[in-house]
Design a protein with these regions (language model features):
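A polyampholytic, Gly/Pro-enriched intrinsically disordered region
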Residues: 68-71, 121, 146, 207-211
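Glycine-rich dinucleotide-binding loop and its adjacent helix/turn
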Residues: 1-2, 10, 29-89, 178-195
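A Rossmann-like FAD-binding core segment of flavoenzymes
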Residues: 1-30, 46, 52-58, 64, ...
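Short aromatic-enriched loop/helix-cap "lid" or pocket-rim segments at secondary-structure transitions
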Residues: 34-35, 107-109, 199
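Conserved sugar-transfer catalytic core signal across GT-A, GT-B, and GT-C glycosyltransferases
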Residues: 82, 173, 199
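An active-site-proximal "capping" alpha-helix that borders the catalytic cofactor pocket
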Residues: 197-211
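Short, hinge-like loop/turn segments at secondary-structure boundaries
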Residues: 39-40, 111-114, 203-205
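Predominant activation on well-ordered alpha-helical scaffold segments within soluble catalytic domains
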Residues: 84, 116, 174, 204-207
């Protein structure tokens, strides 16, 4: 067992493993892509105050300002976690969801309601449904109905903008191995970014098949 070890394709070549299972996860997609409106990416995503949820929680000294917008087009618990983190920091937070209800995939397990109640008790929290960011400015976001640009657009204050989109699979090692003709298998988010329990199930099945 090797813990806390970076491995690249060159190191894997020397291990002479009987089977290689790639479970390298995924990374945030930050190009402004919105699943509900793929032809209209968000403008202004290349600014310093536009970050991922990972950027948010891994840099506690980041200057966040007073107002934050969380843009959720994935529909899972990640957006709720980002909002709760920001509310606890004392920011006024607006959650913008492209869906017709808040984080629909988190509702499956009843995780959304208690989180909203906590955030409403802790501080300023606002929810906008069936909306998307069309453009990010220096201190605000231009928000409107999904796939209806120009219709009743709203300016939402935003010193920090957190984008929560479907992630990109991190499969570079797998692609190198396959190009060399070596057998390898993808599991978890490296195969298809989903909620955590699916990745756990993939790992469980892969381990059982090796026994």
């Amino acid at each position: 067992v090797r813990l806390n070890t970076y491995v690249d394709a060159d190191e894997l070549r020397g291990m002479e493993a009987d089977e290689i299972i790639v479970a390298t996860g995924a990374y945030p997609r930050m190009d402004g892509f919105i699943l509900a409106n793929p032809g209209t990416p968000i403008k202004g995503v290349d600014q310093a105050h536009v970050i991922s949820s990972i950027d948010l929680v891994t840099d506690p000294r980041r200057e966040l300002g007073k107002h934050a917008v969380v843009m959720d087009s994935a529909g899972g618990y990640e957006a709720i976690a980002a909002c709760e983190y920001l509310v606890e920091k004392g920011l006024s937070v607006t959650l913008i969801c492209t869906h017709g209800n808040m984080t629909p995939y988190a509702q499956t397990y009843g995780r959304d309601g208690p989180a909203v109640e906590r955030m409403m008790r802790m501080g300023a929290f606002n929810l906008m449904l069936r909306q998307q960011i069309y453009e990010i400015g220096k201190d605000h976001c231009t928000v409107g109905l999904v796939r209806m640009p120009g219709n009743a657009m709203t300016q939402v204050p935003a010193d920090t903008v957190v984008l929560v989109s479907p992630n990109e699979p991190m499969r570079a090692i797998f692609d190198v191995l396959r190009a060399e003709g070596r057998a390898a298998r993808l599991i978890g988010d490296a195969l298809s970014p989903r909620d955590a329990q699916y990745a756990i199930a993939d790992g469980h099945r892969a381990a059982r098949e090796l026994v």
